[in-house]
Amino acid sequence: MKIVVDENMPYVEPLFGALGEIIPVNGRTLTPEQVQDADVLLVRSVTRVNAALLDANSKLKFVGSATIGTDHVDLAYLAGRGIPFSNAPGCNATAVGEFAFIAMLELAARFNSPLKGKVVGIVGAGNTGSATAKCLEAYGIKVLLNDPIKAAEGDPRHFVSLETLLHEADIISLHVPITRTGEHKTLHLFDEARMMSLKPNTWLLNCCRGDVIDNQALIKVKEQRDDLKLVLDVWEGEPNPMPELVPFAEFATPHIAGYSLEGKARGTFMLYQKLCELLAIPATKRLSELLPPFHFKAVELEQAPDEKALLQLARFVYDLRDDDAVFRNGFARSNGFDTMRKNHKHRREFSALALAYHGQSEVDWLSNLGFSGVGR
């Protein structure tokens, strides 16, 4: 069995090595010739999976995408050919939620404007938006959720209109899929008028899809509104972001919010489980067996951390400033965006860091944030 796989997917060999011949490829430049005799195709969001790619292949048994979204996959085409498909919903939700939360802590420290006491509006209450809300609520932050689709489906959580969210939120974090048409279109959801209407000193974070924000309009808005603070992990025109936009962001990264070691491993692992199910063979591997030990055994707390100390704990796990510096130095180089993604050092999630503290009830919120070993 030939398994064609994006070369940037981790843990492919230990998970799939016993199932067939693994053929690593560049996902962004994948050609029909490279997949014409594949039995299994494993991709990420950089690969367009459609008739143009797969028409020459008559033996494909399974397509898997180690992603939350599926907008890069022609699902109707696969269904029409009877090719099973699976993605990995929620695989990197924790990573994105923690990235957004850490970015807010970093902004709070940079501008001496505590996160505690602010109101955060989350646009899109799916996996990543919910994970962001979980972090914020664990820390005691008021969260407003906007998701008209979830609301219409009967989701029991309380939702507000986008207009209410824009009026009340001090911080806005975007977590919607890209939808280009229809009643709930998200393409350029944040256009010039909407961004100009934001409250003074709003923080705007985009960790979903670059074109949810009109990037050209964002440049115009920032030229008029220095009070608007930006965290941009995604960009219109990826892998070629607008060079003039980058300096306007307080933190800028190359679409790596979901790039935790746990999240990336979880995405590959979910596809492994699905393929084993399809082949009717037992899934004998375990996710926990793949992850290396964290470089800190534990951090002992003498007292419950304040916001400054919480940021330091977060930096033990992931220092956003490092990725920001790498991005600014490398995004304009030839293939710089994709090279940074490919070579990104795998950060860990909060769960990798064990905290020891005698008064456990005072730090239950750290457990809810995701840190392990809290209390003793």
From Swiss-Prot:
RNA-binding as UniProt keyword: no
Stored CDD domains: ErythrP_dh
Organism field: Shewanella sp. (strain ANA-3)
Protein name listed in UniProt: Erythronate-4-phosphate dehydrogenase
Domain of life: Bacteria
Pfam family, one: DUF3410
Keyword line: Cytoplasm, NAD, Oxidoreductase, Pyridoxine biosynthesis
Biological classification of the source: Bacteria, Pseudomonadati, Pseudomonadota, Gammaproteobacteria, Alteromonadales
Pathway given in the UniProt record: Cofactor biosynthesis; pyridoxine 5'-phosphate biosynthesis; pyridoxine 5'-phosphate from D-erythrose 4-phosphate: step 2/5
Single GO MF descriptor: 4-phosphoerythronate dehydrogenase activity
Family, per entry: Belongs to the D-isomer specific 2-hydroxyacid dehydrogenase family. PdxB subfamily.
Residues reported in the UniProt entry to bind NAD(+): D147, D233, G258
SUBUNIT field: Homodimer.
Active-site feature positions: R209, E238, H255
An annotated GO cellular component: cytoplasm
UniProt binding sites for substrate: S45, T67, Y259
